[in-house]
Amino acid sequence: MCPFCFYFCMQIILKTVMEDKKSLAGAWVEAARPRTLPASVSPVLLGCALAYYDGMFDITPAVLCLLVALFAQIASNFANDYFDFKKGADREDRLGPERAVAQGWITPKAMLAGTFVMLGLACLSGLLLICFADWRLIWVGLAIAICVLAYSAGPFPLAYNGLGDVCVLLFYGVIPVCFTYYIQTLSFSLLSFLLSVALSLIHISE
């Protein structure tokens, strides 16, 4: 599925479920921020396209890479919702998209639990990828898991200390493109790196 098709499908789901914004299912869908998910899907698809071009595409690890990206993105969105509320950055009268915890749709405790559920699913999907590549992928997974939380949490949240663009460069470009390609081909390529940087720059400029 191309990123544009994915985006429009998520828009339809969002509009359908969120007709009643007070419904619990609708609140969780809104908290997942479907509009942001194509940013996670597109680098994985690019890595898969490069593997396919080289005749090495493998559907099973490709799907697992996609699940890692989606679960990690949703976990990051949930964490951002929770920690921004705790810091007072998100209030009920904030400008921009409404946030589930600030609006009272989801309790802080439930949002934190949801964060770790999504992060756990991302880690599980990542562990399964070791069967197709190398145990050292654990270090990549650990870096992803740490940054999911560190982006918004801790004494030095990356998003609020000038490192947001660096995170986008790494986690919406270089890492998902290059490692999706690597897991299927067991090699790195200069082309995958250059295209990953180009894609991340597009995300940064949005």
Task: Outline where the language-model segments fall.
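Cysteine-centered motifs
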Residues: 2-5, 9
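Hydrophobic, small-residue-rich transmembrane alpha-helices and their short perimembrane loops
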Residues: 81, 86, 193-198
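Cytosolic, membrane-interface loops and tails of multi-pass inner-membrane proteins
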Residues: 16-25, 82-106, 205
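Intramembrane alpha-helical segments
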Residues: 97-187
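Hydrophobic alpha-helical membrane-embedded segments
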Residues: 68-81
